[in-house]
Amino acid sequence: MPRGQKSTLHAREKRQQTRGQTQDHQGAQITATNKKKVSFSSPLILGATIQKKSAGRSRSALKKPQRALSTTTSVDVSYKKSYKGANSKIEKKQSFSQGLSSTVQSRTDPLIMKTNMLVQFLMEMYKMKKPIMKADMLKIVQKSHKNCFPEILKKASFNMEVVFGVDLKKVDSTKDSYVLVSKMDLPNNGTVTRGRGFPKTGLLLNLLGVIFMKGNCATEEKIWEFLNKMRIYDGKKHFIFGEPRKLITQDLVKLKYLEYRQVPNSNPARYEFLWGPRAHAETSKMKVLEFWAKVNKTVPSAFQFWYEEALRDEEERVQAAAMLNDGSSAMGRKCSKAKASSSSHA
């Protein structure tokens, strides 16, 4: 990383740490005054169906204190199906819903079943880094549900994004081809470690969101409280995210996406999480807030206090980039003059 960029990042982190020490207090005062305090729960609950309460009730949740956001997302991507892809036959008997709530609805609702099958197909194509053709997705949906394909594709895309942090993007409208793109650059296609597994990007974005909303620094207790709402427990291997403690305190820390440190002067020792340098480099507060908003089926500005901070962060990034470009241009001009001067003396 260039020296100028490092110094800019260091300066921004110092400002964030200073701001974070007072943000919880300031946020409480602001939200108490405006009566818009948001007591949030995990936006990503893995279960059997996508549950959604009325829009009116969701709006009221943002206005009343001590109320969690009304909209939660539950995704069941269980499957047991053989199908033919572009050039290969993929046979799978696996379930993402082990130990979760009942999948009775997913077994009786044909649209949910087709959505789950399409999610499995998309995940296989993502792991193999193969292009995705609309014709192949239609084979998964089959003729009986061809008319429902747009709705099924929309739901499958949503599930891929909020659970795994992977976006489905159309790359060629003439050939109806798509590609899956991770929201961040975690190694091994998002699985972090080599071998079998699923992308951890969605979980990382959730953790970054908690840290941001807790004043840019979240205690370990608050992180586990949040993860428990996602049915992810300390010491219990998760069917998608693996061993959670190792993932969040070792793997993501080693990769510099998270910082895990002891709370100053704590006795007995307590620990807290912050954004790591790679998180600052690969995403932003606004992008994380947009992710949370999408999961909760709302808009970033619904999180008013954090939205305003995210806007300030975006402005700081633009200014830092402009300063870096100005510095690079000045250095380039200086080098050009030096070369011209040496040539004239030759």
Curated annotation (Swiss-Prot):
Bias-annotated ranges (Polar residues): 18-33
GO biological process, one term: negative regulation of transcription by RNA polymerase II
Residue span of region Disordered: 1-35
PROSITE patterns, per the entry: MAGE
Gene3D superfamilies: MAGE homology domain, winged helix WH1 motif, MAGE homology domain, winged helix WH2 motif
InterPro entries linked: MAGE (IPR037445), MAGE_N (IPR021072), MAGE_WH1 (IPR041898), MAGE_WH2 (IPR041899), MHD_dom (IPR002190)
Domain spans labelled MAGE: 111-310
UniProt key word Lipid biosynthesis: no
GO CC annotations, alphabetized: nucleus
Protein name, as recorded: Melanoma-associated antigen B3
Species this chain originates from: Homo sapiens
